[in-house]
């Protein structure tokens, strides 16, 4: 775990980024798995930290990955929180990841995400969208994915199971190994 703090003129608010990084084997299936994991994290951050606990503002889960040559990825969970809840937020983020490492997500949740991926692909990569196609093809090659695999996008996406997602969280994301960047104060690290 690495922690870096930055000053904030607002004494009551802390803006944080919990970054969980690792390595992965580049392939379209693995990239899709990472993207599904990102969306699951986004759902959990919203439903638990924002809706249930009501302690964060503007929560967001991002995914950055680079297949070639580094084979690295990272998830960035970011939000703003009253500094008095910073310790609680960290505990809840660790609980969310632990839960995803040990329990499968529901078939319904995963199926809804897969459907969303297919709709987005159809909408963005239409016959008239040459710039989007070019960008997509460059990104495929840059990330160690093949055009042949992309032609089987639906097959790869549908092959990802709830067990695969749980296994990926277990193998790729450790709740105790993260980078924390924050602007403001943190109860745990400013004691």
Q: What do these predicted regions represent?
A:
Residues 45, 161-164:
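Helical mechanochemical/support elements of P-loop NTPase systems and associated helical scaffolds
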Residues 1-44:
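His/Glu-based metal-binding/catalytic segments typifying zinc-dependent metallopeptidases
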Residues 4-6, 47, 62-65, 153-155, ...:
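Generic recognition of flexible, low-complexity loop/linker segments
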Residues 164-184:
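Bilobed periplasmic-binding protein-like "clamshell/Venus-flytrap" ligand-binding domains
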Residues 11-29, 50-159, 177-185:
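M16 family metallopeptidases and their MPP-like homologs
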């Amino acid at each position: 775990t690495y922690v870096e703090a930055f000053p904030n003129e607002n004494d009551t608010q802390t803006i944080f980024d919990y970054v969980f990084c690792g390595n992965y084997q580049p392939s379209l299936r693995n990239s899709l798995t990472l993207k599904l994991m990102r969306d699951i994290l986004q759902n959990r951050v919203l439903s638990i930290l924002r809706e249930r606990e009501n302690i964060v503002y503007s929560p967001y889960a991002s995914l950055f990955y680079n297949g070639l040559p580094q084979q690295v990825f990272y998830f960035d969970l970011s939000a703003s929180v009253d500094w008095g809840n910073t310790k609680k937020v960290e505990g809840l983020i660790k609980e969310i990841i632990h839960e995803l490492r040990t329990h499968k997500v529901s078939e319904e949740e995963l199926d809804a995400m897969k459907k969303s991926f297919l709709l987005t692909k159809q909408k963005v990569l239409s016959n008239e969208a040459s710039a989007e196609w070019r960008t997509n093809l460059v990104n495929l090659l840059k990330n160690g994915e093949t055009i042949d695999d992309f032609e089987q996008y639906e097959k790869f996406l549908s092959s990802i199971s709830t067990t695969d997602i749980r296994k990926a969280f277990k193998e790729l994301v450790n709740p105790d190994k993260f980078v924390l960047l924050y602007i403001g104060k943190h109860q745990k690290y400013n004691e």
